[in-house]
Amino acid sequence: MEDAELSESLSGTIAADAPLAKPARKYDRSIVEGPLVPAVWKIAWPAIITNLISGLQGWVDHILVGNLVGYKANAAIGVSWQIFLVVIVFISSIFIGMSVLVARYAGANEPEKVNRAVYQGFLTALFMSLGILAPIGYFCSPYLLGFLTSDPGVAAEALPYLRIMFVFSFGMLIYFMLSGALRSAGDSKTPMVLGIAMTVLNLVLNIILIRGLGPIPAFGTAGSAMGTSIASGLVGIYALWRLVRGGWVVTFPKGGYAPDWKIIKRLFKFGLPAGFQGIAMNVGGVMMLWFMGSLAQGGAAQAAYAVAYGQLFLLISWSSNALMGASAAVAGQNLGAGNPDRAKAAVNTAAMIGLSGAAFVGIFFFFFPTQLLGIFG
């Protein structure tokens, strides 16, 4: 009954829509037909490459601040990012709900409904980012940092970083939203290109803003947040322009710009369970940092945690997340196409690929820990 109501809501809104400015690309039907392993891998490998490159961006940030500012800067980024991650994971759960709808409608070959779901996800992210995350995050940052660290040097480095990330988070959220929508519709190469562009731009800006260049002063730890915000903001603006202009496999519809509460309700219904799960997992990291911050050498301990777990280990986590997104996209499209057995097999296939990759990286970490940690200063 609820699915029928949502379909009626989508169809009613779409009926008044004008044609898109530019024809959208067709969905890749090999995801719901043909061999399964190539279908999963086709979506997974660009996402893995994107996440690995994004992970290297974090490496560069920590290497620069660790060598130019000191270990307290590593701790500051680690503490700030853990706080930011708890909030961003919860908001990003909306995109999981959006991706579920996109995959189902793409599998059923209903592009108008896909585009409506994407647009409502954008509206929800816009409100939560600018209306909730930015103001509350800015004013609560000192209290959150005071809870996690007793080292005044770490807190002083972390406060401007965290405030910048909260206030200018919208570009990053737009990228996360678009990546999830495109992958769920079967296109993971476009997010890869955007992710590489954002990472390269971020690296250049961070190197300049952290250490300074010519008339540009060295901003230290805050420069890392500034570079991330500028790079993600520029990519977010470009993505919005393309969504309005058309030509991607997902676009914004013409007309029907008001919030559709039936769709938004479904976004939360599908996404909130994953959001609460993500919060529970990341709160564990927050409590670990709180305990470390209470120690006599809390700053050094938090710096070690930020590098070892927050950067090195997350290479495995980000790759796993990419495979999770790929399996969700393939499974969702096959459910939409009426292939439940193939959907279940897609999840198992992605799990086996992820297990093999994690084992390989884990062996590398086991034999070369000193060399890997040494590059962070």
Predicted features along the sequence, with ranges:
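Short membrane-interface helical motifs at transmembrane helix boundaries
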Residues: 131-163, 360-377
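Transmembrane helical elements of multi-pass membrane transporters/channels
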Residues: 42-61, 164, 231-235, 239, ...
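Small-residue-rich hydrophobic transmembrane alpha-helices
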Residues: 75-134, 172-191, 304-369
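Helix-terminus/linker motif at the lipid-water interface of multi-pass membrane proteins
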Residues: 56-75, 145-152, 210-219, 279-314, ...
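Hydrophobic alpha-helical transmembrane segments
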Residues: 161, 194-208, 216-248
